[in-house]
C-alpha cells in the first residue's frame, strides 16, 4: 500500500514507514524498519521528550502509556503486512485495523530518551485476518509482549 497523505510533521519516520501504513503525526509510533523478512519485522522508535503523551502521563515521571507501546507494535505489524504479507491488488481501498488482543503482558516502562525495539512475527492468516505475536524491548529487556489480530477493512467505512 502506498499511502499518499499530506504530512504536517512525522518526526523521524522514514519514507518506507510512511509509504507502508496510513498513520501520521501525532499518532505515528514507528521511526524506521531495522530488519524485514517474510514473516518477521523489527522496527525502532526513539522516544523524544517532546512527545505529546509525556506532557500528562505523568508530569512528575513521564512514561509512555502501555497502550501506546502496544500501538507501536500494531503499526510495526501493519508495515510487515504491507511489505510482505498482502497482495496489494486485493486490498486496494482497505486499511489494517486491530480486531483482537489475545493477551498482553506489561513488564517494564518506557521513558523519554529510550529507544524501543519493536518486533512482530506473523503466525497465521484466516480470511482477511492476520495473527501476530509482538514485543517491545529496550536494551534487550522486554517491556511488552502481546498476541493480536489485524484485519483488513474497507477504508470507506471509517
Task: For the regions a language model picked out, list residue spans one by one.
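Beta-strand-rich interaction surfaces with strong enrichment in secreted/lumenal proteins
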Residues: 18, 60-61, 106-108
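Mixed-charge, glycine-accented linear interaction segment located at domain edges/termini
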Residues: 129-156
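Short aromatic-glycine motifs in intrinsically disordered, low-complexity regions
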Residues: 14-24, 91
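Hydrophobic beta-strand-centered segment that forms part of the acyl-chain substrate-binding groove
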Residues: 2-5, 9-11, 78-117, 143, ...
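Terminal leader/tail segments of proteins
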Residues: 24, 34, 40, 46-47, ...
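Active-site helix/loop of acyl-thioester processing domains in fatty-acid/polyketide metabolism
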Residues: 33, 64-90
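Hydrophobic beta-sheet segments that form the core/acyl-binding groove
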Residues: 33, 100-139
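Catalytic strand-loop segment that frames the active site of acyl-thioester-processing enzymes
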Residues: 25-64, 69
Amino acid at each position: 500500500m502506498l499511502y499518499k497523505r499530506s504530512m504536517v510533521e512525522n518526526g523521524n519516520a522514514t519514507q518506507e514507514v510512511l509509504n507502508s501504513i496510513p498513520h501520521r503525526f501525532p499518532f505515528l509510533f514507528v521511526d524506521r524498519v531495522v530488519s524485514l523478512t517474510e514473516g518477521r519485522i523489527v522496527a525502532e522508535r526513539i522516544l523524544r521528550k517532546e512527545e505529546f503523551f509525556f506532557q500528562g502521563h505523568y508530569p512528575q515521571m513521564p512514561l509512555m502509556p502501555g497502550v501506546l507501546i502496544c500501538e507501536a507494535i500494531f503499526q510495526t505489524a501493519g508495515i510487515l503486512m504491507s511489505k510482505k504479507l498482502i497482495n496489494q491488488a486485493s486490498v486496494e481501498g482497505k486499511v489494517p485495523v486491530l480486531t483482537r488482543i489475545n493477551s498482553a503482558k506489561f513488564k517494564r516502562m518506557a521513558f523519554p530518551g529510550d529507544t524501543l525495539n519493536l518486533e512482530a512475527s506473523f503466525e497465521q492468516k484466516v480470511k482477511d485476518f492476520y495473527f501476530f505475536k509482538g514485543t517491545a524491548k529496550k536494551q534487550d529487556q522486554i517491556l511488552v509482549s502481546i498476541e493480536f489480530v489485524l484485519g483488513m477493512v474497507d477504508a470507506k467505512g471509517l
